[in-house]
């Protein structure tokens, strides 16, 4: 999909499938919505890049998605989860919170990053 829109995709996965605390359903909700939002945000950006990282860090499962975006098109909102993508990010937040996790949204200049951190049930 990224190739279709001329977006450079950088991925890093540093874990085994046994280290993913989410169900397949919830993982699909999180990654699907974050990736869909990233592609949408990159549509009108030249040399767009999407970075996706999945890894375990200090007994947490971390999902990190960063993408280029046109900062001048940012809509103001009191709630970052309502920013541009509405239900998609709400669904991400709801899925992550089911596992006692949380999301950090960090829009800066021309990069938009979402980090989801979910505690692991056991020490790895």
Residues of each region from the PLM?
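Short conserved segments within the C-terminal catalytic ATPase subdomain
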Residues: 2-10
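Conserved short strand/loop->alpha-helix "switch" segment adjacent to the catalytic nucleotide/phosphoryl-transfer site
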Residues: 11-30
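Glycine-rich/acidic phosphate-handling loop/turn and adjacent ATP-lid/helix
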Residues: 59-90
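Glycine-rich ATP-binding loops of the HATPase_c
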Residues: 100-110
């Amino acid at each position: 999909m990224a190739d279709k829109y001329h977006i450079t995709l950088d991925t890093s996965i540093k874990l085994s499938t046994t280290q993913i605390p989410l169900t397949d359903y919830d993982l699909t909700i999180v990654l699907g919505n974050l990736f869909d939002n990233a592609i949408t945000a990159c549509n009108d950006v030249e040399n767009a890049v999407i970075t996706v990282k999945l890894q375990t860090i200090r007994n947490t499962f971390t999902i990190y998605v960063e993408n280029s975006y046109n900062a001048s098109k940012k809509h103001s909102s009191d709630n970052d989860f309502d920013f541009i993508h509405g239900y998609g990010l709400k669904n991400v937040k709801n899925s992550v919170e089911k596992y006692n996790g949380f999301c950090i949204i960090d829009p800066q200049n021309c990069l938009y990053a979402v980090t989801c951190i979910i505690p692991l049930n056991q020490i790895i």
